[in-house]
Amino acid sequence: MSQRDTGAHYENLARRHLERAGLVFQAANVAFRGGEIDLIMRDGDAWVFVEVRFRRNDLFGGAAASITPRKQQRLHLAAAVWLAQRGASFATTSCRFDVVAITGNQLEWLPNAFNTD
């Protein structure tokens, strides 16, 4: 399986998990200069920007540990652009950043994993 196929597989797993939890799928792999959002979901009236991370094992800290402050900043910027295209902003719209971390066969959903400050 190619790296792209692997990523798509785990993003689909994450999407199904979030949908079972009641979130509603909106978009996938939304790319902007400098960043990409893996999944965009709705949770009630809140936009949820989701980063999906997979690691085969936790030898180097696992999937969740791989989301650096720089990656968070890129996600924040991409989400800001996406919101602006819809006439919204962090100040006017309820939103959060979630992480779905998959390490080996274990999936962990981290709602509100980091903030938009």
From Swiss-Prot:
One of its GO terms (molecular function) is nucleic acid binding. Pfam families: UPF0102. This is UPF0102 protein YPO3549/y0119/YP_3803. NCBIfam families: PRK12497.1-3, YraN family protein. It comes from the Bacteria. InterPro entries: Restrct_endonuc-II-like, tRNA_endonuc-like_dom_sf, UPF0102_YraN-like. Belongs to the UPF0102 family.
